[in-house]
Design a protein with these regions (language model features):
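N-terminal, polar/charged subdomain of small-to-medium soluble alpha/beta proteins
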Residues: 1-95
Length: 95
């Protein structure tokens, strides 16, 4: 899984790209059939926002998180996506 990372009003540094890629690779332990990942990191005034769209088998998953810095926003985003992926996996098992 290679995430597609874009920035709005923020420059994506190599360190940030590496951090995000490492965090998103951990999501595969929750659901291994993630096809595509689109991540948007943006800054609105003083708020750092991280959005993600995941294309998975059986649908799409979207999450958004805010933080005081971009690293905190990405951590919050990963937590939300992990919960959603676990729920999605359980739904697929029930059918």
């Amino acid at each position: 899984m290679q995430p597609n990372i874009t920035g709005h009003n923020v420059e994506i540094t190599p360190a940030m790209r590496e951090f995000v890629t490492a965090k998103f690779s951990k999501l595969e332990q929750f659901f291994d059939r993630i096809n595509q990942v689109y991540i948007v990191l943006k800054v609105e005034k003083v708020t750092q926002i991280a959005d993600a769209n995941l294309h998975v088998n059986g649908g799409e998953i979207h999450a958004s998180a805010e933080g005081q810095d971009m690293y905190a926003a990405v951590d919050g985003l990963i937590d939300k996506l992990a919960r959603q992926l676990t729920k999605h996996k359980d739904k697929l098992k029930q059918h």
